[in-house]
Amino acid sequence: MNETNVGLDFRTLNSRLTIEADWYYRLTQNAVIDAPLPMGAGNLLGNRGEILNTGVELSFNWADKIGKDFSYYIGANLTTLHNEVKDLNGLSYLYGGSAEFRTISQVGGELNAYYGYDIEGVYQNAAEIAADPIAVANGLEPGDFKYVDQNKDGKIDNKDRVTLGSYIPNFNYGINLGFSYKNFDFSMVMQGVAGNQIVNRKRGDRRWHSELNYDLDQFENRWTGEGSTNEYMSAKGSVKPWNISNFNSFYVEDGSYFRIQNVQVAYTFPKKDFGKFKMPSI
């Protein structure tokens, strides 16, 4: 592990305001990768990769009092992450995931990025089908997906697959706040991520499990005729191999979220004096 951290801590206004900033650089050498053996003898896990993670960590905290009974605080933090494959034992890429939900690690790209076909829309009418040699060659109909022919060779095959996103967030962030008033205390922690993608496995698993229902969004917004949608396939198309047998961008969704992680409300009962017995505060 080759790691460098540079940080700065700053306090001002009688320490009511605290700011921390850190830059980190972590190059994991001898990372475990599943690399192929010579002569097609399968794969073998080994410490032969290099993975870089770098970014900044920022935090801001403010704490103060108003009068003698009320105190409060608020804080926020942000972490950025750049993930990059630097070396794969001399290889330019390695496949991962499963045959159905393929991932790829490429030198210069992110680790285990989603890898499949990019959808640019839905065929809307017969004229559009007739004008597209790819649609004609594959017997497509209105309501079927239109894949991007990445290399412009007039067909859709493995050479048209591209990275469709990564499960690794570019940003992690959080907010915490609270206050105390006499015997009452309140605190809240919120947290979120952004810049990552997730795979909707339920949509993908319908390829093998026809008893699974559509999700509500897909059902309500399915293609029902020209101009109805350019994002969802038709009901008929949802069982056609062209649309569902290849891992594509339809299964990849935004993984960003923001949530309230914890809320706490407390009351501290004051001490009570019962003669010789004194009950502590609770």
Task: Annotate each language-model stretch with its function.
Residues 15-17, 68-74, 171, 182-184, ...:
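Outer-envelope beta-barrel architecture signal
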Residues 6-10, 21, 58-62, 175-181, ...:
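Residues on the lipid-exposed face of transmembrane beta-strands in outer-membrane beta-barrel proteins
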Residues 1-40, 79, 83, 143:
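Membrane-embedded beta-barrel scaffold of Gram-negative outer-membrane proteins
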Residues 1-18, 44-67, 107-116, 166-171:
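Outer-membrane beta-barrel signature, preferentially recognizing the C-terminal barrel domain
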